[in-house]
Amino acid sequence: MGGNANGSVTTGAGIAGLGSPLILNNVIIRDNQSTGQGAGIYAAGQLLCTGCRFIRNISSANGGAYFTAYAGVELWWRYAMTGCYFSENEAIQGSAGYHSGYSWAYLGYNTYACNKATYGGTVSLNGTAYASKTTLVNNTFVNNRIEATGGVINEIKGGSAVYANLNAASTLSIVNNTIVGNHASCYKNGTPTADFYGAAVHIYNGTPFIFNNVIAGNRSTSIYTGDVYNAGQPATTGYNIFSSTDNIGITPAETDILGTSVDASILLLGNMLESNIVEGDIVPVLALNGGSIETVKVKRRFFGSNAINVLPASQFEEKLLKGDVDNTIELRDKLIFDQRGVERSTDGTSSIGAYEYGKGGTGITETTITTSPVQTYQNDPILYLSAAMVLQDVRIFSMTGSTVIHLGEVNAGETPVNISRLYPGVYISVSYTH
């Protein structure tokens, strides 16, 4: 907290990891400044962060909150940022995070708000040497900015939410995110540059799979796009909400929902999301809506006349999404929760975006279930389940949807569960009754 790297050492003002893995749980990293890469964290080895908060970390180079450094030609580890909060971080590229060398990464259940870059990317994903896989799932990007200055090559500038310059064979899976109210601009001598393509999601190279997202209401000084720009391989999309056809540089699928213009979509988003409209721009409101970090509440389930709770269960299969939504490497599972840890509906009424409409933080629909057959209490390191009836297939899930404890059938009465091996964090218990 409050570190400076501006002398002989210019990187990693908060934490400098020079090779060993960095595993951070529930750590606050704030108010660090560096003249080099990575004001909050500089990681030359593996970086795994869960439940951390990165606030006001400022780099004069790349990676305000964190910078991952890797120049090898073969991948030995993956990066994972899970359930973290990034706000008011600044850098040239990657105000929240900069992945260099390669971008085999899992970014899930995070919130990125009010970060600013002067070149590209709140999250900047880089590495063209070989193919990698990156998944962004159940994240919220709101009120982030790119403020670029016109130069020789302006096409590579952008990504007020996500910037990607990857190997052409690298997959970038963007799944069930809410990306709203972000701004990208590029001026030269006070005039918007004509060759600027800056968008909220800016893919300079790579193979994108874009499913189930709200990517709308994002502004840009570009005359070409504002929500999504893709100069990489053809994008595969489905069940997204976009501002309009002229605000995306991709071909939408039949299941994608589009507004008629950015201005019109901002009004529709203002009706759908907890937000304010200020001078014609949407400013989503973040709050603790039942999860461990701030999210944007869906207050109405319609984008204009289009319902947003239309996702079939098949739309959460990893094989379709081409993304590792539960951070287990293998593409054989499915997305189970929203960003808060609320269980998603499987009856064809799940919601587009990071927030499952109509469900509270417990994952129980408030209008249909008012009591639970299971009560819990903890006496470290034992969690006690007290059930009035036999429970079937009792599981405890992490926030990423991975099963961390599988109890199977549990009899009525009190059942002790040893949770000493679990990291501190938020977990969800799911059970079934006859």
Q: What function would you assign to each model-found segment?
A:
Residues 1-14, 31-33:
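Beta-strand/loop edge motif enriched in small/polar residues
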Residues 9, 15, 21-26, 41-52, ...:
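Predominantly extracellular beta-rich ligand-binding scaffolds that present long acidic/polar faces
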Residues 12, 159, 198, 331-332, ...:
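Short coil/loop residues immediately preceding or within conserved phosphate-binding loops
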Residues 250, 345-353, 408-413:
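A short acidic/small-residue loop/turn micro-motif
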Residues 305-362:
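Surface beta-loop-beta hairpin patches that serve as ligand-binding interfaces in beta-rich domains
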Residues 365-432:
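C-terminal outer-membrane/trafficking sorting elements
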